[in-house]
Amino acid sequence: MPGEVSRSLYEKALTLFPGGVNSPVRAAVKPYPFYVERAEGPYIYTVDGEKLIDYVLAYGPLILGHKHPRVEEAVRRQLEKGWLYGAPYELEIRLAEKILKYYHPGGMVRFVNTGTEATMTAIRLARGVTGRKYIVKFNGCYHGAHDAVLVGAGSAAAEYGVPTSKGIPEEVAKLTLVAKYNDIESVEKIMSKHGDEVAAIIVEPVAGNAGVIPPKKGFLQELRRIASEHGALLIMDEVITGFRLALGGAQEYYRVKADITTLGKIVGGGFPIGVVVADRKIMEHLTPSGKVFNAGTFNAHPVTMAAGLATIEVLEEGTPYRVASEAGRALAEELESLVLSYGIDAAVNHVESMLQIFFVKGEVWSPEDAAKSDKKLYLKLHEELLKLGVFIAPSQMEAIFTSAAHTSDVVSETIEKLRKAFKRLR
């Protein structure tokens, strides 16, 4: 658990940052967040002298674990050459070519700096290409921190979205129509009325910011069909799933193709990145080729390009996926065994190197199902594991991630600690 050094730092941080942190989920660790001294492999080392097995992995980017030597070497090589140019250079071409090998071959790429920027640009691009104003998103799915997507469902009778944050005008939120994840009928209902005005349907192929909620069989394929029938573009937000479920992400894994793909997290190798990828006929609408504006001082940052390229090259060797997926499967199986042994109502959702446990009766196929979970019991599990030296997300609405650094011995140690933690839940 966080110690006195972390407490002292947090008290100082409270005077400097709203809530003491720079992203809200970091404040969810109670009674205050631990502060990191360093990290390597599957471990975080705190300023309080603790060593934690890390299953948060910076909320998804670190599929190779912390401080992978080949990524570190690539970053050091780039730093020797300079770290920001404001001019083109070869590495951005090489990373783009690598991405296009797996997403929209023959297409084009625009590098930005965050997943938020990627989805914001993708939505603007879809509107620019189609000349339409509405987008459709799914309640409980997260696509970053911009006005078009910080929108949830209103009352059952409402057609239009409502802001989920102060500071977003209702008029802006009403341009977003909200459907239910894994519910094709809700999409059909919206599209039957507004389909000729919808620029895009945007979806997390696996709802990774509502825990881990996989798509039902055929759900993504039906979205593909509906979008095409109405002349709308299908945006797959693969900021989490891209290069995680497979080299070709969820689109390869579930055999479905988006019109526009957004990437982030893994593709930056642990450095800030967002990517918009699509076929050439769509991407050429972006400036300077077209009239849909996008620009950024830090777009295609040299250090990020180096880290991202090195990460993908390691992933292409295949072993990292096998190790990460085996770890995810072993942990999911152990959690299922534990809840059965203790007679606890829970659902364990698992897709390769992503998993989450929901303390709820029945299965979890939607964010609405996830919201019914016993959040206090989940937080208790998080706290007990933290005491034992295992760090899982403090919110069940995030994923538990595994990586290539979570080898069988690390997983075995984790399983022992899971068993101890469950004894303390009773």
UniProtKB/Swiss-Prot annotation:
It catalyses: (S)-4-amino-5-oxopentanoate = 5-aminolevulinate. Keywords: Cytoplasm, Isomerase, Porphyrin biosynthesis, Pyridoxal phosphate. Its main location: cytoplasm. PROSITE patterns: AA_TRANSFER_CLASS_3. The modification N6-(pyridoxal phosphate)lysine is found at residue 265. The keyword Isomerase applies. It is an enzyme of class 5 (isomerase). Pfam families: Aminotran_3. InterPro entries: 4pyrrol_synth_GluAld_NH2Trfase (IPR004639), Aminotrans_3 (IPR005814), Aminotrans_3_PPA_site (IPR049704), PyrdxlP-dep_Trfase (IPR015424), PyrdxlP-dep_Trfase_major (IPR015421), PyrdxlP-dep_Trfase_small (IPR015422). Its EC number is 5.4.3.8. It is found in: Cytoplasm. One of its GO terms (cellular component) is cytoplasm. Pathway: Porphyrin-containing compound metabolism; protoporphyrin-IX biosynthesis; 5-aminolevulinate from L-glutamyl-tRNA(Glu): step 2/2. GO terms for molecular function: glutamate-1-semialdehyde 2,1-aminomutase activity; pyridoxal phosphate binding; transaminase activity. Its cofactor is pyridoxal 5'-phosphate. It comes from the Archaea. One of its GO terms (biological process) is protoporphyrinogen IX biosynthetic process. CDD domains: OAT_like (cd00610). Coiled coil: none annotated. Belongs to the class-III pyridoxal-phosphate-dependent aminotransferase family. HemL subfamily. This is Glutamate-1-semialdehyde 2,1-aminomutase. The lineage of its organism: Archaea, Thermoproteota, Thermoprotei, Desulfurococcales, Pyrodictiaceae. The gene is hemL.
